[in-house]
Amino acid sequence: MKNQLLPELGKKTYIMGIINLTPDSFSGDGLLRERDYIRTALLQAEHFIQDGCDILDLGAESTRPGATPISTEDELNRLLPVVRSLREEMPNVVLSIDTYKAETARACLEEGADIINDIWGFRYDPDMAGTVAIANATAILMHNRTQGAQAVNSELGGRYEGVKYDDIVTEVRDWLAEAVDLAVEAGVRPDKIILDPGIGFGKTIEQNLFLLKHIDMLRDLGFPILLGVSRKGFIGHTLNLPQGERLEGSLAANAWGVLHGADILRVHDVKETVRLARMLDAIRFSELP
């Protein structure tokens, strides 16, 4: 069954632009430091759409290694004014909310959000799956076995210590399959499920690279794949570069992902990634008249 929200899945690469409504994003682009962060978020959204972005992903809680969790109240105070403004200014844009809290998801869906992007794959909040199902929303389920105490900091930025895996690709795939079962049992339609391997979460540099290398093996599950590698620590540590200089590494990782099964790219650098994806799609789907 086709996903009506993203009808060209499998025929084009979708680009999801990251809008961080935080003061402490790892990428340094958190908008909460701005005096009028709502207006700044709207301007960033407008630029993203002009550059070819397909989906806007709003997050109000930093997931960088070592970040302090925030309350649902604080999360909603940051998110709802922007969601309402975006819905008023851009009624047709696809809106994704990066949250793992059911109460936050419910409030944002009531204001017109389309997608819930849960970094815990419905494993954190027992009410999340049912909340998404009742709203008939699309769900992004990310693999994540991170423990908060496992953050490691260095001059190249924070990263998470890896979890021990005997076979990381198989274990990630099995974990995601269980997340799908959890979602479907709660009433989420299978055509509204997207999977994310969770690059950068609870994985070593080597594990991230190996999982990315074998991302095509996740296609066996039969669901669209979202890839989120933009500016992440494994790129910085591989290239010995701070987060502000990771564009080329991010583009390389995203290109590999597209060529090996990724359907959606979650990125900070929208314009450059849109051009990359359009060129790759032109080559991949080319036919002679």
Task: List the model feature ranges, each with a label.
Residues L43-G59, H260:
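Catalytic domains of carbohydrate-active enzymes, especially glycoside hydrolases
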Residues N92, R189-K192:
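Short acidic capping loops at alpha-helix termini that bridge into adjacent secondary structure
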Residues L9, Q50, R189-P190:
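Glycine-rich phosphate/diphosphate-binding loops that line cofactor/substrate pockets in enzymes
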Residues Y14-M16, K192, P224:
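Structural motif
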Residues K2-Q4, L9-G10, S25-Q44, T63-P81, ...:
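Active-site-adjacent loop and "lid" segments of alpha/beta metabolic enzymes
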